[in-house]
Amino acid sequence: MRQSWIEKRKNDSVRTQLHYARAGIITEEMQAVANVEGLSEELIRSEVARGRLVIPANIHHLSLSPMGIGVAARTKINANIGSSSLASCIEEEIEKTLVSIKYGADTIMDLSTGGDLDAIRCAVIEHSSVPIGTVPIYQILHDVQGDIKNLTIDSMLEVMERQARQGVSYFTIHCGFLLEHLPKVAKRKMGIVSRGGSLMASYMMHYHKQNPFYEAFDEILAICREYDVTLSLGDSLRPGCLADASDEAQLAELKVLGELTLRAWEKDVQVMIEGPGHVPMNQIERNVKLQKELCHEAPFYVLGPLVTDIAAGYDHIASAIGAAIAAWKGVAMLCYVTPKEHLGLPNAKDVREGILAYKIAAHAADIARGRIGARDRDDAMSDARYAFDWNRQFELALDPDRAKEYHDESLPQEVFKEAKFCSMCGPKFCSYKISQEIVSKHASGESLT
């Protein structure tokens, strides 16, 4: 779809969506986002130009269907997939990609750390119609045999350009965690829980030098500008437990991310900001407000947040609660959490469970925000339920397969798709049926009092 769009711009000196938006040009990608969101093309252009909406769309990902992340758009969700050094299979990552798209992921991050990382990534991009993001430090470390002491700025930039050429649409880079922040980490209950953040800490402590992503930020911007890779500024110091939420370390990094946002915008590079983490419910709104203030309203992209630390095996639920509140208060994209969080590498089944939990959270937030049309599907479901239209109910459900499966466990015969009851109440105790009888009597003139 995008090949002709990209081809006609090939002689432009800058080809980022932010550059075009600032020049007053509405690109085909902006038109596509406006159509999907039900918003005007000019609104999309102006939001991109202000930096409040990003369209992650690497010029080399030609099969990508453009989507927008920002407060003006519906709340988006990201699904994390990826191999590890203990479990690596390209076919499994392709399956996770397809499952993610089937159940509604708006973007996918390939967080692979084991196996043939380039082959996995290229396969994921090839099979994906949604933007693919990465955390480049994982491959950077992989390519230097897992020893952070072998990392050089040249090796960093080589990996990032390679991934950009392959079609990665956004990079998470841990560039706001500085050498001077290290003493603040010592005060924490759980230290650093970000993989990328812990690697940067190891590098800085070994060499007593500044964060290389911060040092090479201008060179990174040049790569992003060339391929229109959106920067997702990572939160190395996100809280990994409730006790560390909103602490001095987290906020010190957030201030630096705000400064780097302005530097990226100067180069026409799109930016979103990553956020926590583990946050008590009563602190979520404050975190969102601080991010908007310190990071100039760049889209906020949060992991959860988890609102309790004791839900192991059910962290997709614990985090979806926080995610719904965060999105209601202005977060633009939610990074899903699966039931395996803190316990192991998720499989395709876990991916499905995580996505559905977050689809619910995102949709509930859009309703609470009063987004036009957000409740239409809910109202249609109410009509289908009251009319006992079972097949329509299955179609409208966020997970049609699960809805039909649960209904058919007790009443599998096709005749029950026309029944005026389900297995919960049976024909005699159905409240809908009784209510309809009451309304019918009232309509025929019978007194209800």
Curated annotation (Swiss-Prot):
Catalytic activity: 5-amino-1-(5-phospho-beta-D-ribosyl)imidazole + S-adenosyl-L-methionine = 4-amino-2-methyl-5-(phosphooxymethyl)pyrimidine + CO + 5'-deoxyadenosine + formate + L-methionine + 3 H(+)
Keyword Repeat annotated: no
Alphabetically ordered keywords of this record: 4Fe-4S, Iron, Iron-sulfur, Lyase, Metal-binding, S-adenosyl-L-methionine, Thiamine biosynthesis, Zinc
Cofactor binding comment, as recorded: Binds 1 [4Fe-4S] cluster per subunit. The cluster is coordinated with 3 cysteines and an exchangeable S-adenosyl-L-methionine.
GO biological process: thiamine biosynthetic process; thiamine diphosphate biosynthetic process
UniProt EC number: 4.1.99.17
InterPro entries in the cross-refs: ThiC, ThiC/Bza_core_dom, ThiC/BzaA/B
Signal peptide limits: none
Known pathway: Cofactor biosynthesis; thiamine diphosphate biosynthesis
Pfam family, one: ThiC_Rad_SAM
Sites where the protein binds substrate: 80, 109, 138, 174, 194-196, 235-238, 274, 301
GO cellular component: cytosol
Binding site for Zn(2+): 278, 342
Cofactor requirement: [4Fe-4S] cluster
EC class of the enzyme, as a word: lyase
Binding site for [4Fe-4S] cluster: 422, 425, 430
UniProt GO MF annotations: 4 iron, 4 sulfur cluster binding; carbon-carbon lyase activity; zinc ion binding
SUBUNIT field: Homodimer.
Function summary: Catalyzes the synthesis of the hydroxymethylpyrimidine phosphate (HMP-P) moiety of thiamine from aminoimidazole ribotide (AIR) in a radical S-adenosyl-L-methionine (SAM)-dependent reaction.
Family: Belongs to the ThiC family.
Protein name as catalogued: Phosphomethylpyrimidine synthase
Organism: Wolinella succinogenes (strain ATCC 29543 / DSM 1740 / CCUG 13145 / JCM 31913 / LMG 7466 / NCTC 11488 / FDC 602W)
Gene that encodes the chain: thiC
